[in-house]
Design a protein with these regions (language model features):
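Histidine-dependent nucleotide/RNA phosphoesterase domain, centered on the 2H-phosphoesterase fold
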Residues: 1-198
Length: 198
């Protein structure tokens, strides 16, 4: 996945609709979008403990909501009481209150960056085109090796209770939330509004 396409989807409002259907939804809530994209300016969710996860179609860098661990100066345990799950809940409510019917494909409250897709199976097949257990085992072992490194490098348990630089993600910090429309898979689509960072 190209770095400029990496993203975490905080809320998918809808999918599999025509461009005119999407435009009608956008037109109905355009004036409400800045409040949604700026929401993280005053509602700051922190994600920690990066790990690589995978399923049959992709690899992702996943995080969990912070719970007071590895606090940096100026941040208190109370600040972590507002979590990524609360952010998703509130964005859902803001969307619904704006008149949108939220029809997400994925409702599991995951916080992940898709970093790679399994597009072709040939890399994990033998010379006959069948799945190769040894290649699969090697892939899983490499993922487990990377996860061991991530935990050792970035988790507070392995760093005297601190989180080294690069070990946490503060949602909306650099740019605020991005609201997009169109073919959004893999970070594509058109930008409607970019929230303010903090």
């Amino acid at each position: 996945m190209p770095q400029d396409k990496l993203h975490i989807t905080a809320l998918e409002v809808t999918h599999s609709k025509t461009a005119p259907e999407i435009q009608e939804l956008v037109d109905g809530v355009k004036d409400k979008i800045p409040a949604m994209t700026d929401y993280t300016y005053n509602h700051r969710a922190r994600l920690v403990k990066p790990l690589i996860g995978y399923d049959a179609s992709a690899l992702a860098l996943s995080f969990v909501p912070a719970a007071g661990e590895g606090l940096h100066s100026g941040r208190t345990p109370e600040d972590d009481e507002f979590t990524y799950h609360h952010l998703r809940r509130d964005l859902f409510s803001l969307s619904r209150d704006a008149g949108l019917k939220v029809e997400s494909r994925y409702v599991v409250p995951s916080s992940h960056l898709t970093i790679g897709r399994f597009i072709y199976s040939k890399d994990l097949e033998n010379e006959n085109g069948s799945p190769d257990p040894d290649k699969m085992k090697a892939l899983i072992e490499k993922i487990e090796e990377i996860n061991g490194w991530l935990a050792k490098e970035f988790w507070p348990e392995h760093n005297d209770g601190t989180i080294p630089e690069g070990g946490e993600f503060n949602v909306g910090q650099e740019k605020g939330l991005h609201c997009g429309t169109g073919s959004l898979w893999y970070g594509g689509g058109d930008a409607l509004h970019l929230g303010k960072g903090y």
